[in-house]
């Protein structure tokens, strides 16, 4: 049996191991297409700001082809370094594209104000054609609709500080698009707006240079469909991270945005490790989890072997990303999601609509957290030097905290949320109608009187005796009440206290002419 277990461990390890690179075969190269990337041909700030202005207009032109759009974006992304050409040549290793660099200098004879650097050859017409200045219609389209503030006619500046602020503002909006351009483009607008507000408050960007939604949609779609552009962006991030010492301000901002980009598309794998394994609940000892635990161990080893590109495997369309999906460990993933929902409020909005989602193990994770509340790990306590008396104190405090949390969370759930307007009185609110409405009013009144006379324990019995027979029971609440009557009783007592307080406040406020009405609709708009 020991030999079988060793063979099984070796089999699992080799099964998930990536292919070993061999020198016997040649490198496979695809059919390349050429991408022209304009870069500044001198160190003048005027040249760089004018080039940035023309490239932003070019991207806003709806008639621009895909490769030309990619070249313009690469040119903007590399403008913050001293030598953009050297940077592009150093980090670019793409089997699908061939990058051609074109140096751009100032020119007074071209409509765009720029020309391609050449030895004695007049390239003004070619530069105007590239920057779409040969067609007045396309020029008008690119002239308007790129910045939200229509009063900004151009972004040409003379001083380096102003140029860095404008360039940093534009780059921040482009880099933020990479976070969800591949994984969740439909829901990306909200998160992108939150990042923009954050950097505006930190004075890293200038609010006046917020780009229009159409311009951002064009860039997001291009990032999603062009793997070569994403490869360049990931290579640029890794190159910035390897740079020792102090980095430029724009480079530090890119590293900050990288915290939202890294591990995109790997939420199932990361959250399973966080909530399923790191919490170290005893449920991990179940036989059902044995095989999936070994699978996760192999995947963690594979993740480390992939090196610095592992967090970007989904963005880079690495085929090995399928091994890390939750379908490879469905039971452990379902259990981890149950643990996460109980521990963190942010997990409540996660989408669990997967075909391999197992509700039984999801419930197992929830119950594991609830019943383990207040318990102190003996191993961790010994490592931290926590005495037995301190452990008992911590358990007691944690139990009271958990009980308060459960009493606030458990209770009847609203089937529909209605908003109260200032022009609505209490008599105009929607009613149940008929006999059922009178029964509910009677039960509430008797419950308040019972609470005042006999206290919370007998009031809860009166509440239970007068529940409407036609009221549907919530399945989750009914299950939890049957499993833990104490929690159900505590929840009912809490509700009766609230109803009694509401009754007292109504009696106190009956003498006033105008009731106080709170309208929360504006908070949700």
Swiss-Prot record:
Residues spanned by motif Nuclear export signal: 425-440
GO CC annotations?
helical viral capsid; host cell cytoplasm; host cell nucleus; ribonucleoprotein complex; viral nucleocapsid
Q: Which residues lie within the region annotated Disordered?
A: 418-525
Which post-translational modifications are recorded for this protein? Answer: Phosphorylation at Thr-279 is required for the formation of the nucleocapsid.
Which stretches of sequence are listed as region Ncore?
1-403
Read off the Pfam families from this record.
Answer: Paramyxo_ncap
Q: Where is this region: Ntail?
A: 404-525
Where found in the cell?
A: Virion; Host cytoplasm; Host nucleus
**Where in this protein does the record put region Interaction with the phosphoprotein?**
477-505
Which keywords does this Swiss-Prot/TrEMBL entry list? Capsid protein, Helical capsid protein, Host cytoplasm, Host nucleus, Host-virus interaction, Phosphoprotein, Ribonucleoprotein, RNA-binding, Viral nucleoprotein, Virion
Per the annotation, the residue ranges of the short sequence motif Nuclear localization signal are: 70-77
Binding positions for RNA per the UniProt entry: 180, 195, 202, 260, 351
Segments for region (Homomultimerization): 1-36, 373-391
Q: In which broad location class does this protein mainly occur, judging by the first location in its UniProt entry? A: virion
Return the similarity comment: Belongs to the paramyxoviruses nucleocapsid family.
The protein's assembly and partners: Homomultimer; forms the nucleocapsid. Binds to viral genomic RNA. N0 interacts (via Ncore) with the phosphoprotein (via N-terminus); this interaction allows P to chaperon N0 to avoid N polymerization and non-specific RNA binding before encapsidation. Interacts (via the Ntail) as N-RNA template with the phosphoprotein (via C-terminus XD); this interaction maintains the P/L complex anchored to the nucleocapsid template during the sequential transcription.
Q: What is known of its domains?
A: Ncore is globular and carries regions required for N self-assembly and RNA-binding. Ntail is an intrinsically disordered monomeric domain in the C-terminus.
Q: What is the name of this protein?
A: Nucleoprotein
Q: Which gene encodes it?
A: N
